[in-house]
């Protein structure tokens, strides 16, 4: 029976987390601190950088084309960064923060000099969080926020554009664009004729991607989502590395052990923590010689 309040909601980030480490997925997406009844979130410098840049660039899609650059983008970035400065962004020293902030400023300057699709018509899906029923029978919903939809008036079609702030390129097996393609096809009426990444850290132009087959993508994603639902029903989310953990779940285990510092709550009331890696090394991580 389908019920969006009891359904399993899956997204690109939650599916990726599950595939990397079921334990990490559980701690990041399902677990709630019994003391606060809030989910937990770990803030880090790369996450802060991505959040600040995305906030600036994505906000432009809500503004009319001829007014998008009326306010200097670097001023917008400065406002976004202030919310993430210091420990709020996972920065424990000024030098590290300066490096990340400078990278963010360079990305914004790149957008100013080479606005590309940001200077053209865009489509905004009228949903705070685009979603659709991946399977009503299995009570599974697919959701996700799309960075940018470029509109082509001649063909009345759209191009999905995803902004990347990481220095690493997405692999060919990434499910991100296939998921976004499904969402856009189900949440608005225009055909998707192109998909691209924009690597803001290194490129002035879009990097086109192959348009995935909708049916094949949906079948693949539903298969993974069913595994996620089964493991949730069993309450079984084990790390592939066993009790020693992995890079995906260890940082969240540190929160549970009281080794992380609480810095506040995000817009969704999650408890946000930061981890100073240099001060949280356990004795087993070092040897006295």
Where in the sequence are the language-model features?
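RecB-family 4Fe-4S metal-dependent nuclease core
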Residues: 1-289
């Amino acid at each position: 029976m389908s019920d969006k309040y009891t359904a399993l909601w899956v997204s690109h980030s939650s599916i990726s987390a599950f595939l990397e480490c079921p334990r990490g997925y559980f701690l990041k997406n399902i677990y709630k601190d019994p003391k606060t009844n809030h989910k937990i979130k770990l803030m880090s410098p790369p996450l802060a950088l991505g959040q600040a840049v995305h906030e600036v660039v994505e906000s432009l899609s809500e503004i009319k084309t001829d007014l998008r650059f009326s306010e200097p983008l670097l001023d917008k970035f400065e406002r976004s960064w202030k919310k993430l400065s210091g420990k709020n962004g996972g920065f424990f020293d000024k030098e590290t923060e300066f490096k990340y902030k400078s990278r963010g400023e360079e990305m914004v300057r790149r957008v100013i000099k080479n606005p590309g699709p940001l200077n053209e018509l865009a489509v905004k899906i009228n949903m705070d969080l685009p979603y659709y029923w991946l399977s009503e029978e299995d009570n599974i919903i697919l959701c996700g926020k799309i960075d940018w939809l470029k509109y082509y008036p001649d063909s009345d079609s759209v191009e999905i554009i995803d902004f990347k702030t990481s220095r690493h390129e997405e692999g060919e097996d990434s499910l991100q664009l296939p998921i976004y393609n499904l969402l856009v096809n189900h949440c608005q009426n225009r055909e998707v004729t192109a998909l691209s990444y924009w690597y803001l850290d290194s490129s002035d132009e879009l990097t086109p991607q192959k348009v995935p087959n909708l049916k094949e993508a949906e079948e693949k994603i539903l298969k993974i989502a069913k595994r996620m639902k089964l493991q949730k029903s069993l309450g079984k989310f084990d790390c592939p590395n066993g009790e020693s953990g992995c890079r995906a779940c260890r940082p969240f285990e540190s929160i549970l052990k009281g080794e992380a510092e609480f810095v506040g709550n995000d817009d969704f009331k999650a408890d946000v923590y930061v981890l100073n890696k240099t001060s949280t090394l356990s004795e087993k991580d070092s040897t006295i010689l």
